[in-house]
Amino acid sequence: MSRKFMQVYEYDREQYLDEFIEDRYNDSFIASPEYYSAEKYMCRYTILNHNCVNVRRCALDSKLLHDIITNCKIYNNIELVRATKFVYYLDLIKCNWVSKVGDSVLYPVIFITHTSTRNLDKVSVKTYKGVKVKKLNRCADHAIVINPFVKFKLTLPNKTSHAKVLVTFCKLRTDIMPIEAPYPGNVLVYTFPDIHKRIPGYIHINIEGCIDGIIYINSSKFSCVLKLHRSMYRIPPFPIDICSCCSQYTNDDIEIPIHDLIKDVVIFKNKEMVYYLKLNNKTIARFTYFNNIDTAITQEHKYVKIALGIVCKLMINNMHSIVGVNHSNTFVNCLLEDNV
């Protein structure tokens, strides 16, 4: 029997809200008068720049989506708690959970959070069309974007005594600006004076086009390479917004006080002895020392902080695409607040 999945279903907010409240009450997941507050549970959405054309198979990083939902004040529209069963059938068509805004469809984003078994959980989502996403949930949060025209089956492990299933809607854009390739030889290299000499008060940088994801830092006593979680771009049109400490300078030649950069930068290493760099408590890069004369890394940290701090501030203000797909370590997870 043929299934008509690709029909367009208009989204009726009022009907959706009535069914949503009624279903929650009848299923005894929650029986509280506060759930009759219509405004609180109205479906809200945000626009995500999406660089994957096959949105039906994409898994987005849940931390990123959580940040977006929090910042954009999006309410999660389904919340199944204190589960008595572990398989949920949610039919987006039957429940009118397919929404259109103009020519764009709002895609449901599914979160599975607060599961009791945490890093032992497996989440399986299967649609009528056979699109199947299975992931070992090691961070207790899992998010999936699925095709809104199909019903899906969500399975949680039998050992799970409770779980929370959250569904919200996001408008995905697949027409973002193509990524500009780096200019030939356009690799960012910082050369510092002797490590025993005074660090200069300002650093001048000039960026044209795209910088690839590698930064080399050189001094007389050590060298290191830093791999950014994402390339940085310099895309027209001008002018662009830049950080407050650089606002008095032009876009082409930026002068940044060193001490404004190193105060929020921390270098740490994990159990595997891999060095990472954090800016404002966000992991933004992994780096490797080589040709290092001293075994103990001391003052070199300051050079690393300066170099990467500059790049990070510029990158934050030059990124046009804010969503990376299927990359849990993409730089997009490291966007900082506007006031940095």
Swiss-Prot record:
- Protein species of origin: Variola virus (isolate Human/India/Ind3/1967)
Superkingdom per UniProt: Viruses
Entry similarity comment: Belongs to the orthopoxvirus B17 protein family.
Q: Which InterPro entries match?
A: Vaccinia_virus_B17
Instruction: Tell me what this protein is called.
Output: Protein B17
